[in-house]
Regions:
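Conserved HGGG/HGGXW glycine-rich cap/lid loop of the alpha/beta-hydrolase fold
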Residues: 12-64
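Active-site loop/oxyanion-hole signature of alpha/beta-hydrolase fold enzymes
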Residues: 56-96
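Gly/Ala-rich beta-loop-alpha elbow adjacent to hydrolase catalytic centers
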Residues: 97, 101, 105
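Flexible "cap/lid" loop of the alpha/beta hydrolase fold
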Residues: 106, 110, 117-146
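Conserved alpha/beta-hydrolase catalytic His-Asp/Glu region
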Residues: 150-203
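Short beta-strand/loop motif that positions the catalytic acidic residue
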Residues: 207, 213-215, 219
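Conserved alpha/beta-hydrolase "acid-adjacent" motif
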Residues: 220-226
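Catalytic histidine-centered segment of alpha/beta-hydrolase-like enzymes
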Residues: 244-257
């Protein structure tokens, strides 16, 4: 059962959902994609081992969190999330980031090396220095229209998300709309700006945490080659390629939820979770 609450962090109200775990251990902190509220991740959360506590939040300006007072970048946002975790009483944590949230998760691992225990990167890349998507795909991501217009989202689902959406583009209505809360257009723009000029490429060799990279075999937004680049640069990494597209963490949650759970609960060097 998820517990929803609002947490005050450096003058901002942040909407948070916590699914308590049945055992003690670091929580899994979920960092969502651009423009997406925490509700979108529910299909994945349902597939995560119940022993693991799962925390997710709406970035300021997205979903149920009011807009930020000033623009931010990933470094500032990682500091902000660190303060949020302090307010929630979390010392150590595991981080999972999907798409845009993968950039935030990498920044968290880099800035909080003693607190971030393990890292999961799903359908994401290294920021501005990456193998980019087709320009026609990128053009469809400039605005949050796909979150506001179900017919439009269905019409572009195959080209934008790939994977299972190529055969069943109408499924995007279920994935994006059933539980989605809209943020402001300004909030979406600020998320775009946060990534301008940011790259994790030179920092990847310094991220020592055990890392699991999840990549779809048919992801138009983040081509698979980016995951292979990350595998080459991260010092303690495993790569899992799944047969789906950019939204695979949601549409293939029955496969990826248990896989992530196994990675997080595995013992390393005799130290239990």
């Amino acid at each position: 059962m998820n517990k929803f609450r609002r947490v005050r962090v450096v003058g901002h109200d942040v909407r948070v959902a916590v699914r308590p775990g049945t055992e003690a251990g670091p929580p899994l902190v979920l960092c969502n994609g651009i423009g997406a509220s925490l509700d979108l991740l529910e299909p994945f959360v349902e597939q995560v081992d119940p022993r693991i506590e799962v925390m997710r939040f709406d970035v300021p300006g997205v979903g149920g969190s009011p807009g930020p007072k000033v623009p931010y970048n990933f470094a500032l946002l990682a500091c902000f999330v660190g303060r949020l975790l302090d307010e929630l009483g979390y010392d150590r944590f595991d981080a999972l980031g999907i798409s845009w949230g993968g950039g935030l998760a990498q920044q968290l691992a880099f800035q909080h090396p003693r607190r971030c225990r393990r890292l999961v990167l799903a359908s994401t890349a290294t920021g501005s220095l990456m193998v980019p998507a087709n320009p026609l795909v990128l053009a469809k991501m400039v605005t949050p229209r796909r979150y506001r217009d179900a017919d439009y989202a269905s019409s572009i689902a195959a080209q934008l998300y790939g994977g299972r959406m190529r055969q069943r583009p109408d499924q995007v209505r279920h994935v994006l709309y059933e539980q989605e809360r809209l943020g402001s257009r300004a909030g979406y723009l600020l998320q775009l700006l946060a990534g301008v000029g940011w790259t994790s490429l030179p920092a990847l060799p310094l991220i020592r945490q055990p890392t699991l990279v999840l990549a779809g075999s048919d992801d138009p937004i983040v081509p698979l080659v980016n995951a292979r680049i990350m595998r080459a640069l991260l010092p303690n990494v495993s790569l899992h390629v799944f047969d789906d597209g950019h939204l695979g963490l949601l549409t293939a949650a029955d496969e990826l939820g248990p896989l992530v759970s196994e990675f997080l609960t595995a013992q390393t060097g005799g130290t239990p979770r």
